[in-house]
Amino acid sequence: FNLGDIYESRAIYAFYRDAIDGAIAQMKQTPYVNEKVYDEETGRMVTKRLKKSDALLPANPFNGFITDCHDCEHAKKQRTPYTKLSFLEKVKEMEAKIAQNDDVYNNALLVGNAFYNASYYGSLRAFYYNNILGEAGSLGVKDENRVLLLGMDKAKQYYLLAQKHATNDEQRAKIAYLLAKTERNEFYNQAYFYKNKDGANY
């Protein structure tokens, strides 16, 4: 592992604890390293000096849709591309507005979407790809990362906060649907992810 892996992993763990200041501080410390990346213009792999904090996320972290379709989200052109660092900074900005009682419904909804999308079920799996976590896009997650990456607690926390501040039926219906998605995922966790070979829950 290199220093970038270490700082990035600390930032990822801090994010899932909702310790956003700590996540930002750790992500900012990722150093520049030489990385092989695909150059679309030349169609070849090239070496570039990059920081892990500057890695572009493949989808808008704050969008929430009826259907989870990673490929659909990744194919869309982003009006505002987010890096791992700018994503964290935007979450901090929204959480500050919530603390100031500023447009709580919309900010809580968007932060809830951020936590949902950064889970295994969302469109931002790339956020948690890290050599120390040992995650890089497989169809499942490692046993030791299940609670971290399959958990819906933070998404539900912010969706419930948004629900409390909903002012019309459309807003209430939207939150009800998003909460239903988290409950569906919790069912999937129990039915498929948290069972060992004997069928007992972890």
Show the residue positions of the predicted features.
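Extracytoplasmic/secretory-pathway proteins
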Residues: 1-202
